[in-house]
């Protein structure tokens, strides 16, 4: 380290002896990672969580989008289905179920990782997100204010 900090975090990992798996998914490739939510973005989950299975069809355009995006980005799928605390479904973890679904629709080879953690990425594609620029705009967001009214919060 020559008395200072390494120029990058991967250097820091080797200098201080941390295990790379102690970092969030995608750490080593964050400069090209694109994180995409599974349910509601790729997988149609119109029945809600249901029993944890991946029962839905692909969201229209999602297959082609992942194939196209994977030419430029390293695709990471993030989903609560992959949480280790979730119960097994037919003896399979949520991560296994997601990989099987991706394989069934021919896109498993375009995806680098499936994780329950928020991965390090350049951009996140999620159906339950609000784009942030500053707090004044965020607090005035029609979407946020609509949710507040629905929850009777002023």
For the regions a language model picked out, list residue spans one by one.
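HAD-like aspartate-dependent phosphatase fold
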Residues: 2-154
């Amino acid at each position: 380290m020559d008395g200072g900090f390494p120029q990058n975090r991967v250097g820091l990992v080797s200098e201080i002896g941390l295990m790379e798996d102690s970092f969030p998914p995608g750490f080593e490739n964050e400069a090209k990672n694109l994180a995409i939510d599974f349910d509601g973005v790729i997988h149609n989950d119109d029945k809600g969580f249901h029993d944890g299975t991946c029962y839905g069809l692909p969201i229209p355009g999602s297959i082609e989008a992942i194939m196209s995006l994977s030419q430029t980005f390293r695709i990471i799928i993030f989903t609560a289905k992959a949480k280790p605390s979730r119960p097994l479904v037919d003896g399979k973890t949520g991560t296994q179920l997601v990989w099987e679904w991706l394989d069934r629709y021919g896109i498993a080879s375009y995806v680098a990782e499936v994780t329950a953690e928020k991965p390090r990425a350049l951009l996140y594609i999620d159906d339950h997100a609000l784009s942030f620029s500053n707090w004044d705009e965020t607090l005035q967001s029609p979407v946020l204010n609509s949710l507040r009214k629905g929850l009777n919060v002023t």
